[in-house]
Amino acid sequence: MTLKAPFPWFGGKADVADEVWRRFGDVRGYVEPFAGSLAVLLGRPEPFDGVETVNDLDGLLSNAWRAIRDKLAEVAVYAAKPVSECDCHAEEIWLLERKAEITAQLEANIDWSDARAAGYWLHGICCWIGSGFCD
C-alpha cells in the first residue's frame, strides 16, 4: 500500500515515486539523505521489512516526522485549522524562536518530539505561499 506525502515540498518527488520504485526494484535497504516529504519512501509499492534510513538537517521537519509517528492526534489539534495570515506569521515567529532548541532536543533524545511545533510547522508549510517558511 502506498501513502501520499502529507505536505507539499519543493523538490518533492511525489510525481515520480512510482517510476523510482519501478527502476529500483525490490531493494533490501533504503536510504533517504534529504527526507523532505518522504514522497518516495511513502510511495513504496510493496511491504518492506528491511532497513529504512531517513535523514534531514532541518530540525523542524525532523520534529514533524517524529511527532507524526508518535503523537499524531495531538499534532492534528495544532495543524488542522482554517488558514489565517496572522496565525501563519505568529506560528512562524514562535517556531523560529525555538528552532535551535527543538533541534538540540531531537539530537539529545531519540524519544523526544514536540506536537505543538510539528502542528504549527505543518500548518505553515501547507498554507505558505512561495518559499521561505521558517527559513
What positions do the PLM features span?
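Class I S-adenosyl-L-methionine-dependent methyltransferase module
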Residues: 47-135
